Amino acid sequence: MELTSTRKKANAITSSILNRIAIRGQRKVADALGINESQISRWKGDFIPKMGMLLAVLEWGVEDEELAELAKKVAHLLTKEKPQDCGNSFEA
């Protein structure tokens, strides 16, 4: 039972990390770390899930507030309206 709980936490942590990378952009994250963007791609398959499990075992956890904030950011990005292309267009 404890292993299942730990795996669920690990999956939540891994998902949170991957979502944050997606929101910030893989290139920006790589630049901030001083590595090549392709390294981030390699990490996604192996390193990040292992780190998620390590953090879960250490009971690092994912805060509900962090997930809520992440959800708000994603929703904002998805609903962001584009400005009109032409200044002459007017809707009456």
From Swiss-Prot:
GO terms for biological process: regulation of DNA-templated transcription. InterPro entries: Cro/C1-type_HTH, Lambda_DNA-bd_dom_sf, Transcrpt_activ_CII. The keyword Transcription regulation applies. GO terms for molecular function: DNA binding. SUPFAM superfamilies: lambda repressor-like DNA-binding domains (SSF47413). Residues 26-45 bind DNA. Keywords: Activator, DNA-binding, Transcription, Transcription regulation. It comes from the Viruses. Binds to two promoters, P(RE) and Pa23 and activate transcription from these promoters. Homotetramer. Belongs to the lambda phage CII protein family. This is Transcriptional activator protein C1. It comes from Salmonella phage P22.
